[in-house]
């Protein structure tokens, strides 16, 4: 049996917060700040956004490894944070996250239309998140009330290693019955999510304005002066450089045009691993 390169995309694997729901990715960010505050440790919104895209325990561990935050913890507790301390913060983070997730559950403008267009082109819709399953259960239910149902969902604690490892993306490939990773596109607003897609051998699309990197509401984003928006896009594109996304667009609303372009490239024999 001979290997045949895929001629078209078969699946889009979408992130959740900052990609399909929660413009600006506020739900997890604010809760990190609140969870640390309950332990008497101040963390800014900007600091909390830094590791976004990772699983939430890993995110907290990464924050605790930042020298400035580690020093604040040492001042409060007389020692640097251990893994047990990270787990304690995580266990406080979880109920706060579940309690407040509904406050940031609105679909990103244009998401439903874009996803419907992808389905019309024959794509299955996979998904994955840095949220654990207990949070994803609520996120998925809220999205369904707003009209969005993915074909498959993989939470960060349903695989051995979360992002930037490729396990969640590859779990979607298996569950959706996709026969070639090059027939998949991974869409995300964070560099760990783009690295996940790259390491899985997929096409990747980084979202520059709807998620964690810009960190604004939709109204704030639309109200930005053109020059400021251009500066922010340049900053965010530079932030993504190391993850090497194949495409950068502002929001998921632009995804159908990207898919058409990828299909044209596949038809010419191009593959994601070679670009």
UniProtKB/Swiss-Prot annotation:
Residues engaged in binding Mg(2+): 15, 17, 189
Note accompanying the cofactor annotation: Binds 1 Mg(2+) ion per subunit.
Residues forming the catalytic site: 15 (nucleophile), 56 (schiff-base intermediate with substrate)
One GO process term, biological-process aspect: DNA repair
Cofactors named for this entry: Mg(2+)
E.C. number(s) listed in UniProt: 3.11.1.1
Broad enzyme group: hydrolase
GO molecular function term, any single one: magnesium ion binding
Highest taxon, organism lineage: Bacteria
Enzymatic reactions: phosphonoacetaldehyde + H2O = acetaldehyde + phosphate + H(+)
Purpose: Involved in phosphonate degradation.
Subunit structure: Homodimer.
Family: Belongs to the HAD-like hydrolase superfamily. PhnX family.
HAMAP family: PhnX
PANTHER family: PHOSPHOGLYCOLATE PHOSPHATASE, PHOSPHONOACETALDEHYDE HYDROLASE
Entry protein name: Phosphonoacetaldehyde hydrolase
